[in-house]
Amino acid sequence: MLIFEDVISGDELLSDAYDVKLVDGAVYEADCAMVTVGNGDIDIGANPSAEDGEEALEDGAETVNNVVYSFRLQPTMFDKKSFTTYIKGYMKRIKAYLAENDPDSVEAFEKGATAYVKKVLGSFKDWEFYTGESMDPDAMVVLLNYREDGTTPYVAIWKHGVKENKI
């Protein structure tokens, strides 16, 4: 299994246990799901049994996003201006990291990241933002949105901002 770890904070952000796809050569997207957790049990979202009708949440149970929950991601807030400021600084940090560790990928990163940032800014109100467990303000912000069906959530992380650790 591969774990995608933030190169700045070391936070684990995603794993290949989810169906990870590369987009624009710069971003990994993975569909996720809403699951019910509580009392030590995790409901993977299977249909309720026909006899019981609709299952009600048990005491202490809550519905959470499985990626956000599994990797202990923390919600954060941005307006468009503050996100633009953050993303410019983050892109500079990743570009410096790549110049030192993988100089051949700088151009591909710049091209793909620019295209994806434009996509995010174009539909800014639809996005949710999460930091890694350490809440490092210089590290990657995980992006969350919904597919065209309006019900399937997905997360997006920057390919060049993570290292893949095989476990």
Swiss-Prot record:
Q: Which UniProt keywords apply?
A: Cytoplasm, Cytoskeleton, Microtubule, Protein biosynthesis
Please state every residue range assigned to the domain named TCTP: 1-167
**Where in the cell does this protein reside?**
Cytoplasm, Cytoskeleton
What InterPro entries does its record include?
Answer: Mss4-like_sf (IPR011057), Mss4/transl-control_tumour (IPR011323), TCTP (IPR034737), Translation_control_tumour_CS (IPR018103), Translational_control_tumour_p (IPR018105)
> What's the superkingdom here?
Eukaryota
UniProt GO molecular function: calcium ion binding
Alphabetically, which GO biological process terms does the record hold?
cytoplasmic translation; negative regulation of autophagy; negative regulation of microtubule depolymerization
SUPFAM superfamilies in the record: Mss4-like
Give the primary localization class: cytoplasm
Q: Which GO terms describe its cellular component?
A: cytoplasm; cytosol; fungal biofilm matrix; microtubule; mitochondrion
Q: Which family does it belong to?
A: Belongs to the TCTP family.
Protein's job: Involved in protein synthesis. Involved in microtubule stabilization.
Name under which the protein is recorded: Translationally-controlled tumor protein homolog
What species does this protein belong to?
Answer: Candida albicans (strain SC5314 / ATCC MYA-2876)
Q: What is the lineage of its organism?
A: Eukaryota, Fungi, Dikarya, Ascomycota, Saccharomycotina
